Amino acid sequence: MTHQPQQSPQFFLTAPSPCPYLEGQQERKVFTHLVGDKANEINDLLTQGGFRRSRNIAYRPACEVCRACISVRILAGEFEMTRNMRRVWSQNRDLIGRVHKAQPSTEQYALFRDYLDARHRSGGMSDMTVLDYAMMIEDTHVNTQIIEYRRRGPDSFMSAKGDGELIAVALTDVMADGLSMVYSFFLPHMQERSLGTYMILDHIERARAAGLPHVYLGYWVEGSRKMQYKIRFTPQEHLGPRGWQRFEG
């Protein structure tokens, strides 16, 4: 991880750039570095205030005219699967997720590249090298973990180990009040498994087991098709001018 000398957060504002979600809009972000002994505490507070983490930076939209980005968190304790979600959960019952320290591997990067090339070829992350990927995973001063999903082995119920190829990966921050899903990716040719949905369901179960009330999904952008999946996990809360407000869908 990189090291910065300051202990107190200093905030900065980016220059305007094209919005990746809404055509014709310009985005700006306010950001700070998450460093020092209080990085975990600051990350918790900022995430609860609508920030997201990328490497050792916490950021949130600060657009001049648009307020479409809305922070979303699932109420894990009240969540109930829909019929379709139960089907997804059942389809992936042969998978097991194992928690690791935030350390990259060549196997992870190969899966990451397959995912980007298939799903986000023209996106802002499409040219990430293996070094860029390693920095995305390792450059953190907060409580971050990697969850690797593999098929269950014959001794999985005793050892909690999966067997076989790597199928999906989630980069997750563990906070005082929940789990924050920073980034996730999966084998793109297994569309019938709905692995993105499955990993969110798995995080909800993990939050419940740990007694944590929330799963943070980042931003929902009304009008952006790629973000619509986030509001299917109800009940949830949306962050607005009056704080977190309940949303039932």
From Swiss-Prot:
GO molecular function: arginyl-tRNA--protein transferase activity; leucyl-tRNA--protein transferase activity
Catalysis: reaction(s): N-terminal L-glutamyl-[protein] + L-leucyl-tRNA(Leu) = N-terminal L-leucyl-L-glutamyl-[protein] + tRNA(Leu) + H(+); N-terminal L-aspartyl-[protein] + L-leucyl-tRNA(Leu) = N-terminal L-leucyl-L-aspartyl-[protein] + tRNA(Leu) + H(+)
EC number: 2.3.2.29
Entry superkingdom: Bacteria
Family classification: Belongs to the R-transferase family. Bpt subfamily.
Coiled coil (UniProt feature): none
Stated role: Functions in the N-end rule pathway of protein degradation where it conjugates Leu from its aminoacyl-tRNA to the N-termini of proteins containing an N-terminal aspartate or glutamate.
Organism listed in the record: Brucella abortus (strain S19)
Descriptive protein name: Aspartate/glutamate leucyltransferase
Location in the cell: Cytoplasm
GO CC terms, sorted: cytoplasm
Ranges annotated as spanning the membrane: none
Chief localisation class: cytoplasm
Biological process terms in GO annotation: ubiquitin-dependent protein catabolic process via the N-end rule pathway
Keywords: Acyltransferase, Cytoplasm, Transferase
InterPro entries: Acyl_CoA_acyltransferase, Asp_Glu_LeuTrfase, N-end_Aminoacyl_Trfase, N-end_Aminoacyl_Trfase_C, N-end_Aminoacyl_Trfase_N
The keyword Thylakoid appears for this protein: no
Keyword Repeat in annotation: no
